[in-house]
């Protein structure tokens, strides 16, 4: 049994989110939530919400026992960037790209 949760367009870069995802890949659910709860990174809060959503999906849709679940796979994909302009000297402008990512969490036995 596999249960999936996806968060599309998360407002954080994929590179920063992968640092957190690598820490919980393959861990049991309880341990993964503890790691995320005590991580000081912004990405940990976002990833924790996606993991909790996957747990809720497992309970509601599959009737699964959450004590036996673990993080089977978690991967972060780059999403479209939000493009903004900022004013520079002498009438010029520079483009700023605000990065976004897609977070996919799969739970299984």
From Swiss-Prot:
- Return the Pfam families for the record: Ribosomal_L22
Q: What is the lineage of its organism?
A: Bacteria, Pseudomonadati, Pseudomonadota, Betaproteobacteria, Burkholderiales
Question: Record's family?
Answer: Belongs to the universal ribosomal protein uL22 family.
Q: What keyword terms does UniProt attach to this protein?
A: Ribonucleoprotein, Ribosomal protein, RNA-binding, rRNA-binding
How does this chain assemble?
Part of the 50S ribosomal subunit.
Is Transmembrane helix among the key words of this record? no
Provide the GO biological process annotations. translation
**Gene Ontology MF terms in the entry:** rRNA binding; structural constituent of ribosome
What Gene3D superfamilies has UniProt attached to this entry? Ribosomal protein L22/L17 (3.90.470.10)
Q: PROSITE patterns attached here?
A: RIBOSOMAL_L22 (PS00464)
Entry-linked InterPro entries: Ribosomal_uL22, Ribosomal_uL22_bac/chlpt-type, Ribosomal_uL22_bac/org-type, Ribosomal_uL22_CS, Ribosomal_uL22_sf
The protein here is known as: Large ribosomal subunit protein uL22
- Is Ribosomal protein given among the entry's keywords? yes
Function noted in UniProt: This protein binds specifically to 23S rRNA; its binding is stimulated by other ribosomal proteins, e.g. L4, L17, and L20. It is important during the early stages of 50S assembly. It makes multiple contacts with different domains of the 23S rRNA in the assembled 50S subunit and ribosome.
One cellular component term (GO) for this entry is:
cytosolic large ribosomal subunit
Which PANTHER family does its entry note? CHLOROPLAST 50S RIBOSOMAL PROTEIN L22-RELATED, LARGE RIBOSOMAL SUBUNIT PROTEIN UL22M
């Amino acid at each position: 049994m596999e249960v999936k949760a996806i968060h599309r367009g998360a407002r954080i870069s994929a590179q920063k989110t992968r640092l957190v995802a690598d820490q919980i890949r393959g861990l049991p659910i309880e341990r993964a939530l503890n790691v995320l709860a005590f991580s000081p990174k912004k990405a940990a809060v976002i990833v924790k919400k996606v993991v909790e959503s996957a747990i809720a999906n497992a309970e509601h849709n599959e009737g699964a026992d959450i004590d036996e679940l673990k993080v089977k796979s978690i991967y972060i994909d780059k999403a479209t960037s939000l493009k903004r302009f900022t004013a520079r000297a002498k009438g010029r402008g520079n483009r700023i790209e605000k990065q976004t990512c897609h977070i996919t969490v799969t739970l299984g036995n």
